[in-house]
Amino acid sequence: MSRIVVLGAGESGAGAAVLAKVKGFDTFVSDMSAIKDKYKELLDKYGIAWEEGHHTEELILNADEVVKSPGIPNDAPLIMKLKEKGTPIISEIEFAGRYTDAKMVCITGSNGKTTTTSLIYHIFKSAGLNVGLAGNIGNSLALQVATEQHDYYVIELSSFQLDNMYNFRANIAVLMNITPDHLDRYDHCMQKYVDAKFRLTQKQTDRKSTRLNSSHQIIS
């Protein structure tokens, strides 16, 4: 049985852990901070082992794959140790995308993405479509994939959520705008932040499935 370790037990991490457990993985969750009671209850409900307040390296470094919550930087010491071992490190969105055939409409941008995501979701819902709202708003995508059956997902994605995404492909990708933000996470390099945002389009095979704001200088 393959071992999945989830780092971080917030909305993203707890959801990823439930999906991993449902799919038959040996699952362990570790959070350096205190875990909220509602997430402890969720993990306990599915019989998932967890720890809080510290990372026990011997329980983490033996993972076959790690699902990293978006709040953990890629240069954190534990992440660097996992990289040195060659352990694959992916995002919750990447993990969840493996287990659903639902159509994905994904929105990112420095400003306005929550409003746009909510509007698209409302349009889908009003049209009678079976749609879930996920990502930076709504419930964890992984948790919905594990416990619900949606035909469509409208997903708001921050740059942090786009990090550690490699094979995930949106059916429709919307990139609204890019302005300087979170640059401390990207070595104060604007290009690295831009690259993170453009991860949303990395697997697009049809130009018609990508919506770029061509009036925005950085994107155009």
Model regions: which residues?
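N-terminal leader/targeting and accessory segments in enzymes
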Residues: M1-S91, F95
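Phosphate-binding loop of NTP-binding sites
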Residues: E58-L61, P70-K208
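Short alpha-helical scaffold segments that flank and stabilize functional sites
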Residues: L19, K23, Y99, R199-L200, ...
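Charged/polar, solvent-exposed surface patches and flexible loops
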Residues: E41, K45, R98, L143, ...
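Single conserved hydrophobic/aromatic residue that forms the stacking wall/gate
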Residues: K208, L212-S220
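Histidine-centered active-site/metal-ligand motif
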Residues: H54-H55, H182-L183, H216
